[in-house]
């Protein structure tokens, strides 16, 4: 960890020196803090695609800088502080665990704009938050999972037991169960966003339990690589398309498309219209996309999945529509009732049918 931190600090110094050199040209400086490597093929890769889109959109009006592999905690606060001191006009902090650090640093630098991904705290006027309705994409993946499983056992690799992740678990299970009433779900918690070894171990543990469809809310391609070792096991790209594993084991993907948001928000800094806001877009807004469904999926299942995605996109269907019960059997949503955003944002329970407890 010490070696990685030292390397990260050195790399940050180089990146910020580059951004500082651009200040004489009055370029807007957009900076990005990443929890994983840009080569992870998933979460961080997609955020970096957004950064590159900013460069493509604004050309010589903007300079970007980034730091990858920044641990959540004190290291993140140091990186954000250094970025602010080095002349960044807007800083995107791209992991839930950066929330407190983002707000702490923002309070010290009121002239710098901060954008925190997946969080909810906006303690000062220069902090905005943004997220994607990942649970919408999970509904589509869940439908495919329910139709494709032969063992009737699907598995889910969770990162941390926070509402965003629990939403995805519940949405996947609800729609797998609708597609296949006999399906069961096992959840394994990796307690990491990005750790290929731990993610592979989690996938292996699920496969050993007889799971033949794996979903994940972790950042690397390791679960798909593990699935590829066992004939008949399939999975889904997470955050990015992960098309290298198509047509199987990767049969589709939930793709996070951050580019339009990053281009919009940097543009607002450039033209002086930036204002604090909270954004939570989904399939309809283009922030959540469904990756190509491979030929390993039967045509009728593909058509059903595409129809489900379309109904979510146009607002005619909400993935959390009753009747739905909580895990303990108590009524959560009555027939036709739709979950409100406040409940979803604080979700801390499983729906009926999921076995196991949410870690505290």
Task: Say what each PLM segment does.
Residues 1-24:
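Gram-negative bacterial Sec-dependent N-terminal signal peptides
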Residues 24-360:
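A residue-level marker of the well-folded mature domains of exported/periplasmic proteins
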């Amino acid at each position: 960890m010490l070696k990685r931190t030292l390397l990260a600090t050195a790399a940050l110094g180089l990146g910020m020196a580059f951004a500082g050199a651009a200040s004489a040209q009055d370029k807007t400086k957009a900076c990005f803090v990443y929890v994983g490597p840009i080569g992870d093929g998933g979460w961080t890769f997609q955020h970096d695609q957004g950064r590159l889109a900013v460069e493509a959109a604004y050309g010589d009006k903007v300079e970007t800088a980034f730091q990858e592999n920044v641990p959540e905690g004190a290291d993140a606060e140091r990186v954000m502080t250094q970025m602010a001191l080095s002349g960044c006009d807007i800083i995107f902090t791209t992991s839930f665990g950066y929330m407190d650090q983002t707000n702490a640093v923002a309070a010290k630098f009121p002239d710098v704009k901060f954008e925190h991904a997946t969080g909810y705290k906006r303690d000062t006027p220069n902090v905005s938050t943004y997220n994607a309705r990942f649970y919408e994409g999970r509904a589509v993946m869940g439908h495919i999972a329910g139709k494709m499983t032969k063992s009737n056992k699907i598995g889910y690799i969770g990162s941390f037991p926070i509402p965003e992740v629990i939403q995805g678990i519940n949405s996947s299970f609800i729609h797998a169960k609708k597609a296949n009433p006999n399906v069961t779900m096992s959840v394994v918690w990796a307690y990491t966003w990005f750790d290929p070894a731990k993610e592979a171990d989690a996938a292996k543990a699920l496969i050993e339990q007889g799971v033949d469809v794996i979903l994940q809310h972790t950042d690397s391609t390791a679960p798909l690589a593990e699935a590829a070792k066992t004939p008949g096991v399939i999975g889904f790209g997470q955050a990015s398309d992960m098309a290298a594993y198509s047509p199987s084991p990767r049969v589709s993907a939930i793709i996070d498309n951050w580019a339009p948001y990053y281009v919009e928000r940097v543009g607002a800094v450039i033209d002086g219209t930036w204002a604090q806001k909270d954004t939570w877009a989904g399939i309809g807004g283009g922030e959540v996309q469904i990756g190509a469904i491979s030929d390993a999926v039967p045509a009728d299942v593909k058509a059903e999945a595409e129809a489900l995605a379309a109904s979510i996109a146009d607002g005619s269907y909400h993935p959390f529509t009753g009747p739905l019960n909580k895990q303990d059997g108590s009524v959560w949503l009555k027939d036709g009732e739709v979950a409100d955003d406040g409940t979803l944002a604080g979700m801390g329970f499983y729906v009926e049918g999921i076995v196991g407890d949410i870690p505290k």
